[in-house]
Amino acid sequence: MSLYMLVSTFAVAFIITVIGVPLFIPFLVKLKFGQSIRDEGPKMHEKKSGTPTMGAVVFITAMLISFLVFSFISGEVSAATWLLFIALALFGALGFLDDYIKVVQKRNLGLTSKQKFLGQVVISILFYLVYHFNDFAETLNIPFTNIEVDLGWFFVIFILFWLVGFSNAVNLTDGLDGLVSGLSVIAFSAFGVIAFYQEQMDVAIFCFAIVGGMLGFLLFNKNPAKIFMGDTGSLALGGSIAAISILVHQEWLLLLIGIIFVIETASVILQVFYFKATGGKRIFRMTPIHHHFELGGWSEWRVVLTFWGIGLVGAIISVCVVIF
């Protein structure tokens, strides 16, 4: 029965997305909701300008429908269900607002960094309050040990850092056709297996709803992309994967399962720090680091496949660590 629910959750999210995206693309084109390309970005990306964006509206809708329907059918509705709903829906809503400002008001940078950060903090605090008042463990496991560290009220700082950090990390990574879509299929599959192994069916249902939606979206988002997810999708996925790692109590494994997200973010931080420290010198040709490889002569598809491969290795190792 449990496996049937997971397969059904996956299938419904996949089917809704596969049907919905082709119907949504002409609607976005009619509204002229096209992606703007940064002037400072790689020149080979200029041809992507005008590609419909905000496609995440379809797959987030598909995921939420599938997740909530099968959660209620299976009787697996819990506090974790609503925590995951908060992460996906509210981070998605913040991203939607950012995208709307970019494509409708023609402000290429969208929300200011302060506005976006404030929104992320508010959502993270709401997540923490629901988490705290439902008596979830506010501890962190020391990797490869059975030692638990009780953080007490400092746990709220960790929640803020984790949710804000990973929502931004996935957002930074979303710069190549299919990159985040494929990495999300891999990462959420890994957490789905871990949640199933831990018998946390509510979390497992959520994971496989996302895998179904993302696999369906990948069919249209792979190179050459017919549609982009926008910040609507990247913020929602980043907030969700951070929330899942907390609920399955495998926070540190997210650094391995989401290793590409970590590397992309680290490359930006290092580049900025080195640039300021040396008065204008750079470590990489351009960051996030996927652009470094593009400017080094790699095709976009080669970068994406390589990064998927690294993400897959990290995910497999993580699942093995938990199960074996």
From Swiss-Prot:
A single GO BP = cell wall macromolecule biosynthetic process
| A Gene Ontology term for the protein's cellular component | plasma membrane
Cofactor(s) needed, names only, are: Mg(2+)
Tell me where in or outside the cell this protein is found.
Cell membrane
First-listed, main subcellular location of the protein, grouped into a coarse class: membrane
* InterPro entries in UniProt: Glycosyl_transferase_4, PNAcMuramoyl-5peptid_Trfase, PNAcMuramoyl-5peptid_Trfase_CS
Bilayer topology: Multi-pass membrane protein
Q: What is its EC number?
A: 2.7.8.13
One example of the protein's molecular function in GO is:
phosphotransferase activity, for other substituted phosphate groups
Quote the catalytic activity from the record. UDP-N-acetyl-alpha-D-muramoyl-L-alanyl-gamma-D-glutamyl-meso-2,6-diaminopimeloyl-D-alanyl-D-alanine + di-trans,octa-cis-undecaprenyl phosphate = di-trans,octa-cis-undecaprenyl diphospho-N-acetyl-alpha-D-muramoyl-L-alanyl-D-glutamyl-meso-2,6-diaminopimeloyl-D-alanyl-D-alanine + UMP
Highest taxon above the source species: Bacteria
Which controlled-vocabulary keywords does the entry list? Cell cycle, Cell division, Cell membrane, Cell shape, Cell wall biogenesis/degradation, Magnesium, Membrane, Metal-binding, Peptidoglycan synthesis, Transferase, Transmembrane, Transmembrane helix
Which pathway does UniProt place it in?
Cell wall biogenesis; peptidoglycan biosynthesis
Report the protein's function. Answer: Catalyzes the initial step of the lipid cycle reactions in the biosynthesis of the cell wall peptidoglycan: transfers peptidoglycan precursor phospho-MurNAc-pentapeptide from UDP-MurNAc-pentapeptide onto the lipid carrier undecaprenyl phosphate, yielding undecaprenyl-pyrophosphoryl-MurNAc-pentapeptide, known as lipid I.
Q: Which family does it belong to?
A: Belongs to the glycosyltransferase 4 family. MraY subfamily.
Q: Known PANTHER family for this protein?
A: PHOSPHO-N-ACETYLMURAMOYL-PENTAPEPTIDE-TRANSFERASE, PHOSPHO-N-ACETYLMURAMOYL-PENTAPEPTIDE-TRANSFERASE HOMOLOG
Q: Any idea what this protein is called? A: Phospho-N-acetylmuramoyl-pentapeptide-transferase
Instruction: Please name the gene that encodes this protein.
Output: mraY
